[in-house]
């Protein structure tokens, strides 16, 4: 089968987008082994995540599915959500600028701004351990986490997918490649976890690196940016609107506090279109 795809990125976090509304048969062929082959940057297309556009099932405008480079399906991807919104608008699947999108963890609402950037209502952050999921006796702003022979301090939150965020003094010296895999696979996170490393510059600016579950470190992570900011706000360290600087560029994150949704704003870029044999 020939598969049509569009390559996109949000701050260097790169994706291929598959229109399964026009290519419903593609879902039959996209098993984990095929996704891993397509994700290979030497022998395939190369991407951090594969995004699928499907018909809505629960009253939204579209259904949004995400697969990591290892072939596993995940609940949410913030940079991908912005690319998803630009894709359905640019390819005339909708004429709306605000779109209701179904995900595995509920509805998100991307809005295409006049300057071409996309703002996404990512929903209300979840801090209860059972909702993350994270094995802890009670909800706390900071948890100790044993990593090998050392104990680190993390904050834990779900932004539709699980995140563990730690504050470090210098992002350039962050142990992302050594600690990231250990945090990702920590037994207290039964569904694994995205590991965030945050440096606070001031109350309105942070720097961030994220080791993503099933992918590794990426140039940017939208849900990771949301997670870092809401954890910083919860601990009284950040203001309600924060600029998050990552290797791939900047996102603006806003959270007005308890029971309020977190908003993410940033770019979504189309790189090229292509066809590949499955």
UniProtKB/Swiss-Prot annotation:
Biological process annotations from GO: lysine biosynthetic process via diaminopimelate
Sequence positions that bind substrate: 13, 49, 68, 78-79, 161, 194, 212-213, 222-223
EC number: 5.1.1.7
Gene3D superfamilies in alphabetical order: Diaminopimelate Epimerase, Chain A, domain 1
Database matches in Pfam families: DAP_epimerase (PF01678)
Keywords: Amino-acid biosynthesis, Cytoplasm, Isomerase, Lysine biosynthesis
Gene Ontology molecular functions: diaminopimelate epimerase activity
Pathway: Amino-acid biosynthesis; L-lysine biosynthesis via DAP pathway; DL-2,6-diaminopimelate from LL-2,6-diaminopimelate: step 1/1
Gene Ontology CC terms, in alphabetical order: cytosol
InterPro entries: DAP_epimerase_AS (IPR018510), DAP_epimerase_DapF (IPR001653)
Superkingdom: Bacteria
Disulphide bonds in the chain: none
Active site, renumbered: 77 (proton donor), 221 (proton acceptor)
UniProt cross-references to SUPFAM superfamilies, sorted A to Z: Diaminopimelate epimerase-like
Record site feature (Could be important to modulate the pK values of the two catalytic cysteine residues), residues: 163, 212
Catalytic activity: (2S,6S)-2,6-diaminopimelate = meso-2,6-diaminopimelate
Role of this protein: Catalyzes the stereoinversion of LL-2,6-diaminopimelate (L,L-DAP) to meso-diaminopimelate (meso-DAP), a precursor of L-lysine and an essential component of the bacterial peptidoglycan.
Family: Belongs to the diaminopimelate epimerase family.
Assembly behavior: Homodimer.
Protein name in UniProt: Diaminopimelate epimerase
Species of provenance: Nitrosomonas eutropha (strain DSM 101675 / C91 / Nm57)
């Amino acid at each position: 089968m020939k598969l049509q795809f569009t390559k996109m990125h949000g701050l260097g976090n790169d994706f291929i987008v598959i229109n399964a509304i026009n290519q419903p048969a593609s879902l039959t062929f996209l098993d984990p082994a095929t996704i891993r082959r397509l994700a290979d940057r030497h022998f395939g297309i190369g991407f951090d995540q594969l995004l699928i556009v499907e018909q809505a099932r629960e009253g939204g405008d579209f259904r949004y599915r995400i697969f990591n480079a290892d072939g596993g399906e995940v609940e949410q991807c913030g940079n991908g959500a912005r690319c998803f919104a630009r894709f359905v608008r640019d390819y005339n699947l909708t004429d709306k600028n605000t779109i209701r999108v179904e995900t595995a963890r509920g509805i998100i609402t991307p809005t295409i701004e006049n300057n071409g950037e996309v703002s996404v209502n990512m929903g209300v952050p979840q801090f209860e351990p059972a909702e993350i999921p994270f094995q802890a006796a009670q909800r706390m702003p900071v948890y100790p986490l044993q990593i090998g022979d050392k104990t680190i301090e993390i904050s834990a939150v779900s932004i539709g997918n699980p995140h563990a965020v730690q504050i470090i003094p210098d992002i350039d010296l962050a142990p992302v490649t050594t600690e990231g895999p250990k945090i990702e696979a920590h037994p207290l996170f039964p569904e694994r976890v995205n590991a965030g490393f945050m440096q606070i510059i001031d109350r309105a600016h942070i720097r961030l690196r994220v080791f993503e579950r099933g992918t590794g470190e990426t140039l940017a992570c939208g849900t990771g940016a949301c997670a870092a900011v809401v954890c910083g706000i919860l601990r009284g360290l950040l203001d309600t609107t924060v600029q998050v600087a990552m290797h791939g560029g900047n996102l603006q994150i806003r959270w007005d506090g308890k029971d309020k949704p977190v908003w993410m704003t940033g770019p979504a870029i189309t790189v090229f279109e292509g066809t590949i044999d499955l």
